């Protein structure tokens, strides 16, 4: 078996166990603390994703690929099991939320290390694409499997089966420890201190020749307005149509994700500016949820649209960052910061969405978010047109002066 195939096989085992365990965890949270509790845990997860960018940069400058993967996989396994144990022991929700955030900082640091190993094993873009598609597909399978597990009187996985799920949640990282023995990635050179997310927040430049920082922030805003219902899909599907439809919801999202490359290719052919393309994708993410409560079929349609549009938005945004980078090091820093900004937007989305759903319903939320994204596109285009008109006016005046 080649190195790339071993890495993909490792990712399949880990991602299946992760998605199965996280889905069971999410259903437990929803039953114990409601959709608001699930929203807080998802927000903590996304904050962990965002914080993993600087952690990964620092660790990769101190550890080679083998050490980084082994340190993160052992730490993550302990945090996965510990977080589940805290929930089942009745720990305060705030403690569980902190544990979820910490677990995801470590998880996404390790995930960055795995992607670096994939690139080292096969630098072709198609290799990374296959890796990402394999992860997305197996995560959908894990979510669907969790939704179909036998449940106890409370409608939740319990007893010995629950113990097995929790144990597997941590043990599925064992292949990562083993594959780390053949790591190819050396310790990285330290990144310049001026780059990254901190530079964006201070108003500095993310990349020397990169896209405008406002463009990256705009992508985060689209995620804020468009991603909330999708990221709460496990809880929403269970509340709207029953636990069994969680499986179909996950599979519909995965099917939509497979269509995303076609959407991005069409956007590239039409050369649509982000001011139009990104809010349109956000409308696709949120708009279908306006009808998701009508029937299970409407739920599946909403998730199909969400998977297609969310994956396309992330792919298009990352492609714009990567093509503007002056060096591979710039690509890494740029992509990490773009992911962090998206994660912060999504964290805010899943924090406020449960309250709106509780008061007005998911249909109202989906419609309101889609309308807000349409208004955002109009405002963005109006700003572009006014700046363009001002530029033409200056050009005419200069010609006359000459």
Q: Can you say where each PLM-predicted feature lies in the sequence?
A:
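Helix-loop boundary and gating motifs at the non-cytosolic
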Residues: 1-50, 202-253
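Hydrophobic core of transmembrane alpha-helices in multi-pass small-molecule transporters
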Residues: 12, 92-110, 220, 298-312
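Intracellular juxtamembrane helix-capping segments at the cytosolic ends
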Residues: 25, 108-122, 233, 312-326
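Helix-to-loop junctions at the C-terminal end of transmembrane segments
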Residues: 51-67, 150, 258-273, 357-358
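C-terminal ends and interior cores of transmembrane alpha-helices
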Residues: 74-91, 281-294
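Cytoplasmic helix-loop-helix junction between adjacent transmembrane helices
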Residues: 99-137
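C-terminal transmembrane helical hairpin of 12-TM major facilitator-type secondary transporters
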Residues: 273-314
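A late C-terminal transmembrane helix in Major Facilitator Superfamily
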Residues: 328-360
């Amino acid at each position: 078996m080649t190195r790339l195939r071993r890495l993909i096989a490792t990712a399949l085992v880990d991602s299946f166990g992760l998605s199965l365990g996280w889905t069971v965890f999410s259903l437990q949270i929803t039953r114990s603390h409601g959709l608001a509790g699930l929203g807080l845990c998802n927000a903590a997860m996304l904050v962990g994703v965002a914080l993993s960018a600087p952690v990964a940069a620092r660790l990769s400058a101190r550890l080679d690929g083998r050490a980084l993967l082994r340190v993160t996989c052992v730490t993550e396994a302990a945090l996965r099991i510990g977080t589940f144990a805290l929930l089942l022991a009745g720990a305060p929700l705030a403690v569980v939320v902190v544990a979820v955030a910490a677990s995801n900082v470590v998880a996404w640091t390790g995930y960055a290390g795995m992607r670096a190993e994939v690139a080292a094993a096969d630098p072709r873009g198609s290799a990374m694409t296959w890796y990402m598609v394999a992860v997305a597909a197996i995560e959908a399978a894990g979510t669907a499997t969790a939704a179909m597990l036998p449940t106890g009187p409370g409608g939740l996985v319990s007893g010995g089966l629950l113990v097995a799920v929790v144990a597997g949640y941590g043990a599925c990282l064992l292949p990562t420890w083993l594959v780390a023995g053949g790591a190819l990635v050396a310790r990285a050179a330290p990144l310049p201190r001026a780059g990254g997310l901190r530079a964006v927040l201070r108003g500095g430049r993310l990349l020397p020749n990169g896209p405008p920082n406002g463009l990256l922030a705009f992508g985060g805003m689209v995620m804020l307005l468009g991603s909330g219902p999708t990221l709460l899909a496990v809880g929403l599907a269970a509340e709207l149509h029953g636990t069994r439809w969680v499986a179909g919801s996950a599979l519909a999202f995965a099917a939509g994700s497979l269509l995303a490359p076609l959407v991005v290719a069409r956007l590239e052919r039409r050369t649509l500016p982000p001011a139009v393309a990104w809010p349109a994708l956000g409308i696709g993410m949120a708009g279908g949820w306006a009808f998701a409560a009508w029937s299970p079929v409407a739920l599946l349609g909403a998730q199909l649209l969400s998977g297609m549009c969310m994956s396309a938005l992330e792919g298009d945004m990352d492609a714009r960052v990567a093509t503007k980078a002056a060096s591979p090091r710039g690509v890494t820093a740029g992509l990490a910061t773009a992911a962090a900004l998206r994660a912060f937007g999504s964290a805010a989305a899943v924090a406020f969405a449960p309250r709106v759903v509780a008061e007005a319903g998911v249909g109202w939320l989906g419609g309101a978010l889609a309308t807000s994204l349409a208004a955002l596109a109009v405002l963005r285009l109006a700003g572009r047109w006014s700046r363009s008109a001002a530029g033409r006016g200056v050009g005419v005046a200069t010609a006359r002066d000459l």
